Each structure stands twice: as structure tokens, then as C-alpha cells.
């Protein structure tokens, strides 16, 4: 199977209306924002999308809507299997695949319980692959409900199937990512989720970025991905700025992203299902996001020099 585009893939948020329905107009506007700022793809129906708090119908509708809004301008990948049983997960993944996404994303922690072995994960992974044929897959080390990092044994098993296009890595460890890149040897793409290590992992062969901060300033991450070899000194300086700016990830995500989107002229409620935005995104958090917006403008002007 072919590869998805390398580059920057925001982990897309899900906007909600005041009465707790998906805000489809805002969904379309977010996709336009990603396209305008040069994103190579979108990871829809992920943890940042609050997928564990979406109904099955909402997950399927969201994947389909993002595919339609992207209109071939960007790759769209999506997950959405949150059930406990593999049978139910297969049903969920089949429905996501039918929306026309470029790849369906498995979640490592859904394939085996925390106390179960890699052999269980691999067996369940193969069951899914057999039940959902002719569909390209990715694998996501989703932190919720527990983070299950992919071992070399699992990575090799994935590569041997020939069905996996990419990994959304969340180990946040540059050394481990370099080891994974060497093990995979081009058989599966690897997308880093961590700004602080992004540049280092690009140099070691990673294929792109898929993380929270691509919701704020994807164009800066796109610049780094496309120019780190041509302008290494400037890339190093930009990497340092992005690393510090990424500290806002702790400011009440995903409410903070929704607040930032409003500042950019994309209106939406701050309402979230996975957190209480009123208590988890406070006055100081808003101040930090206000300052981030200023910093983004400063960095963009600096890049033009």
C-alpha cells in the first residue's frame, strides 16, 4: 500500500454548540484553517477530538465531514474505536473506513488490556486486519485510558503485515524514536507528537508531526519540516521557540485550543465533554493563550527576515 503524505497533521479538536451538539459549521472552518496554514493532513476522531466522549454516530459523521471539507487538499486519517470487545471495535473501524478517510488509525491500548501481553495485542491487531481488508492503517499510542507504547516486537509484527502506513508516536523520547526509525527502515512512517524533540527526530528520519500544537500554529511546524535541512541555524532557533511555546499544552486542553481558535476569528463555544472548561481553563490559562498569540506573530515576522 502507498504512503500518506509526510508533514504536519493536527490532532483535530471537536467544537460543540452551547446545547452540546457537534458544531458542524465550526468543523468546516477549522478544516479551512488547517488548509490555509499549509497542513499536509488532519488526524480527526482522536483523543483531542474527545472521541471517548462522542457517540458512534458522531464519530462516523465527524470523519465523513472532515473528509468532505478537506476535499482532497489534505490527507485525512481517523480513529474512533473505543469499545472494549474486538468485535465492536471491528464494527466501529469498518464504519470509519467507509467514510473515505485515507487511513484508519488503530489505538494500541484498545487492542490489549494493560496487564495483557504483546502477543494478545498482535493477535487482536491481526483479527482487525483480516476483518477490515483492503484498508490502510495507522497506529496511535493514545494516552487514554492508558498509554501503551509499541515495543520492537509489535513494531516488527506491524511492518510484516504490510498494512500499516504510519505510527503516531507519543513516547516523546528522541532516542527511542531514532531506534524506531532504524527498526522500521522506511516500512512504516513515523509522526512525532512532541515539539521539543521534533527537530531532532526529523534529523533522525521521522516523517512529520502530529500533535496538539499543530492546532495553534501549524504553519510554523510546516516551515520547520520543510526547511530544517536548507536553513539549519534558523531551524534550531525556531525549534527552541516552539519547544517553549508548547508548554501551553497543559492549559486546559482542548478548551485552550478552542479559545485560541476564537482569537483567530473561528467562533465556537469553549464547551468540552472531556473537561469542565469553566474550572480547568482559568484566567491565567487564558492569559497564557493571549500571550501565545502575540508570540506567534513575533515568530512569523522573525521568519520573514
Please report, for each region that a protein language model flagged, where it lies by residue:
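Active-site beta->alpha loop and helix N-cap motifs at the rims of alpha/beta catalytic domains
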Residues: 2-149, 300-303
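Short secondary-structure capping/turn micro-motifs that flank functional sites
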Residues: 50-51, 112-113, 175, 199, ...
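C-terminal alpha-helical cap/extension of soluble enzyme domains
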Residues: 7-13, 37, 217-305
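Catalytic alpha/beta core domains of metabolic enzymes, predominantly
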Residues: 127-132, 142-251
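Soluble or luminal CAZymes and related metallo-dependent hydrolases
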Residues: 26, 58, 120, 172, ...
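Ser/Thr-centered flexible coil motifs
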Residues: 55, 151, 279-282
Amino acid at each position: 500500500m502507498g504512503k500518506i503524505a509526510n508533514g504536519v497533521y493536527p490532532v483535530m479538536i471537536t467544537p460543540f454548540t452551547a446545547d452540546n451538539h457537534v458544531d458542524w459549521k465550526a468543523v468546516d472552518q477549522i478544516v479551512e484553517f488547517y488548509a490555509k496554514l499549509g497542513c499536509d493532513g488532519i488526524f480527526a476522531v482522536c483523543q483531542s477530538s474527545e472521541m471517548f466522549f462522542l457517540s458512534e454516530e458522531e464519530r462516523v459523521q465527524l470523519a465523513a465531514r472532515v473528509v468532505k471539507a478537506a476535499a482532497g487538499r489534505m490527507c485525512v486519517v481517523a480513529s474512533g474505536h473505543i469499545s472494549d470487545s474486538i468485535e465492536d471495535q471491528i464494527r466501529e473501524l469498518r464504519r470509519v473506513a467507509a467514510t473515505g478517510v485515507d487511513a484508519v488509525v488503530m489505538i494500541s491500548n484498545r487492542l490489549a488490556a494493560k496487564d495483557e501481553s504483546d502477543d494478545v495485542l498482535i493477535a487482536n491487531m491481526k483479527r482487525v486486519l483480516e476483518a477490515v481488508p483492503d484498508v490502510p492503517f495507522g497506529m496511535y499510542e493514545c494516552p487514554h485510558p492508558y498509554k501503551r507504547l509499541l515495543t520492537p516486537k509489535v513494531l516488527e509484527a506491524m511492518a510484516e503485515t504490510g498494512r500499516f502506513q504510519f505510527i503516531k508516536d507519543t513516547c516523546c523520547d528522541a532516542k527511542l524514536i531514532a531506534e524506531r526509525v532504524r527498526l522500521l527502515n522506511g516500512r512504516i512512517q513515523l509522526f512525532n507528537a512532541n515539539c521539543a524533540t521534533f527537530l531532532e527526530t526529523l534529523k533522525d528520519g521521522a516523517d512529520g508531526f502530529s500533535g496538539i500544537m499543530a492546532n495553534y500554529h501549524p504553519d510554523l511546524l510546516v516551515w520547520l519540516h520543510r526547511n530544517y535541512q536548507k536553513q539549519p541555524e534558523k531551524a534550531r532557533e525556531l525549534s527552541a521557540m516552539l519547544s517553549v511555546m508548547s508548554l501551553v499544552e497543559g492549559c486546559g486542553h482542548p478548551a485552550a485550543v478552542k479559545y485560541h481558535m476564537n482569537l483567530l476569528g473561528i467562533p465556537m463555544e469553549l464547551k468540552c465533554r472531556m473537561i469542565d472548561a469553566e474550572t480547568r481553563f482559568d484566567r491565567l490559562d487564558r492569559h497564557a493563550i493571549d500571550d501565545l498569540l502575540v508570540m506567534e506573530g513575533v515568530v512569523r515576522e522573525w521568519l520573514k527576515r
